[in-house]
Amino acid sequence: MQTLRQEAARPCIPSGTLEASFPAPLYSDDYLSLEGSRWPPAIRQATRWKYTPMGRDAAGQLWYTGLTNSDAWEAWYNLPRAPASPFREAYNRWHSCYQHRECSMPSAYTQHLRETAWHDPIVPAQYQAPSTRWGSALWKDRPIRGKEYVLNRNRYGVEPLWRASDYVPSLSAPQRPPGTTQNYREWVLEPYCPSTCQRSPPSLTPTPR
């Protein structure tokens, strides 16, 4: 009973006012995790202010955070130049942060950790292997029936040996509708019946004199 009275006499501090988890310092490149379904990594964008004399405007200076690379072609959102041996500064920096967690895990859990931690809806998951993956599924270009190109649906996988039409690319000659050629002098002006595949008899037109 006396213990309860002593605890009641203490000043109560709401837990919401206490900073339990201290944020990463601005000069740090440590990867933080965004709260969500996949907990993707993120780097706090550190914005510093240059020291300026009194009375002058301070210019904002964006410091290096790790998501950018020294080479613009090797940015994190671009595909690597050499798919067999890609080198990503941001990926290597992220992998070094999570490498200590992968040492005590099986290979299946390690793969799941990479997919969930380095998740981006635009680019596939970053793997050292040249095989392309999208999430946990291996991406392969398979001929799916009904999903080929509409222009040459019946000629899927067959390259035409002759030059295709300039109006609609890769459109086969029997399916080319009349009036799609660039030369209007070759247009057939006679009426055509698609059901009977016949043309109407030529009508008598007065010849100009």
Curated annotation (Swiss-Prot):
User: Biological process (GO) annotations?
Assistant: flagellated sperm motility
InterPro entries registered for this protein in UniProt: TKTI1
Known function: Microtubule inner protein (MIP) part of the dynein-decorated doublet microtubules (DMTs) in cilia axoneme, which is required for motile cilia beating. Located at the center of the tektin bundle where may function to recruit tektins or stabilize the bundle.
**Keywords linked to the UniProt accession:** Cell projection, Cilium, Cytoplasm, Cytoskeleton, Flagellum
Q: Does the keyword Cytoplasm apply?
A: yes
The taxonomic lineage of its organism, from the top, reads: Eukaryota, Metazoa, Chordata, Craniata, Vertebrata
**Annotated protein name in UniProt:** Tektin bundle-interacting protein 1
Annotated gene: TEKTIP1
How is this protein annotated for GO cellular component? axonemal A tubule inner sheath; axonemal microtubule; sperm flagellum
- Assembly: Microtubule inner protein component of sperm flagellar doublet microtubules.
| Subcellular location field | Cytoplasm, Cytoskeleton, Cilium axoneme; Cytoplasm, Cytoskeleton, Flagellum axoneme
Write down a Pfam family by its short name: TKTI1
